[in-house]
């Protein structure tokens, strides 16, 4: 299995150029997601570990009450007012978040996008997250392989305000288009990365079209959990599913044979290494002019935190797969 954390540390060592100016004081990082969501929970421990391991003053996880851009902006402004001097943010809006990032950068508070990118032009220093399009593409290819290259599939995905959702929808479509005409997407259900809408819409789909669908790909946390539970409750292993992330419901469904596999991400590594890099930026480090950035549809300053497919053969050691 790939050691993602080691890879990311090595990658940053290659692209950062120390130009120390001194006198920047103690780094206090705020890690702010777009709203409440289980994916981001790992950022809390990541920040605590970054403080301990790298000598940061703070690296605190703070969550807006709702998925609302204005609430996220108000929270960020409040945190900066409390003395936080570096911000890692999951964009509440791929374009709209740029306004506050620019204001912070102008005020000497460096920022970066974490787990999802803002669109360029931007004053964010970089975007560090899963190549979500590539992950969705690989997951769909694994599903197509499990289906023997033919069948009807459904795609359940996340919030439409999430900058990753469109990338995932396009990637699933690309993988299907490469399947030689044997695979058809019969339903895409988006904007369901919360339990109530996911439970309602996925179970309604299964009741109405469960007999017609051969495979399911989920590209957001909550739809993966709800779909895995639905297949488990049905007790029918005919439908193949590839999920995302590492919720215990999904992992148990893999062990029990109701889910084929899941695409793991690395939220802990994002928060841990992201905090480290923001400290280096505040100390005066600069990125090399020839830094080997990756490019996505949103940015040409992207670092991939990694993704890996896990199935029944290695689900018991999935923690190792995330490292």
Listing of model-derived features with the role each one plays in the protein:
Residues 27-54, 59-74, 84, 90-94, ...:
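Extracytoplasmic "Venus flytrap"
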Residues 1-28, 53, 80, 102-109, ...:
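Short, low-complexity disordered leader/linker segments with a strong preference
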Residues 53-65, 155, 176-193:
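Short beta-strand elements in bilobed, periplasmic/extracellular small-molecule ligand-binding domains
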Residues 77-80, 85-106, 172, 191-253:
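Hydrophobic alpha-helical
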Residues 25, 72, 128-153, 167, ...:
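Hydrophobic alpha-helical segments within soluble ligand-binding/sensing domains
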Residues 95-134, 138, 145, 152, ...:
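Flexible loop/hinge segments that line or gate small-molecule binding clefts
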Residues 25-27, 164, 175, 179-182, ...:
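Hinge/cleft segment of the Venus flytrap/periplasmic-binding protein
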Residues 39-54, 135-142, 163-183, 197-201, ...:
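Short, solvent-exposed amphipathic alpha-helices that sit
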